[in-house]
Amino acid sequence: MEFQSIAPDVKLGENVTIHKFVNLYGCEIGDHTKIGVFVEVQKNAKIGKNCKISSHSFICEGVTIEDNVFIGHSVVFINDTYPRATNGQGRLQTEEDWKVEPVLVKRGSSIGSNCTILGHVTIGENAIVGAGSVVTRDVPPNAIVAGNPARLIRTIDFPTHPEDKEARYVLYEFLRNQRS
């Protein structure tokens, strides 16, 4: 029984790990990248080297993810600013009826679980996007953003270790205060 759908035009780097129930169409995935279960990566999407794409994430056409990026569980990228079912003539839209709004995630960034990243956004190098955030505009390099819409919490001097307790504490405190 087949548990993956990998189109013949997919370009896979060396030592790529692809878990079950994954759909890959016309995309590029760099060396040593891990793709979790129930992930879909559409055509013309690019994922760099040493990335981790966690389960249930959706990476649509026009998304570029550079090297060393972490994508949490259930992250959704959106490439259409004004999605509609039908075109101006009242017919079901086709690929010719819409324009892809690109998304760029720069190297070393981390996007927390359950985030939504809207089209025409750049997430800067080493940025951290807090879990559950909705990113509607560009995120500066070395920034921590969180919320709906995501807003700047603070910047961090990089390089930092992925287990930087100060960065995690700042993000935790922000999210905790949002609930109260």
Question: What residue ranges belong to the model's regions?
Answer:
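Flexible, glycine/small-residue-enriched loop-and-beta-strand segment within the central core
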Residues: 1-8, 18-121, 149, 156-157
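A generic membrane alpha-helix/interface feature
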Residues: 56, 86, 91-92, 138, ...
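C-terminal/domain-terminus segments
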Residues: 120-144
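Conserved beta-strand-loop-alpha-helix hinge in the C-terminal portion
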Residues: 141-166
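Acidic/histidine-enriched, glycine/proline-rich intrinsically disordered or flexible terminal extensions
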Residues: 163-180
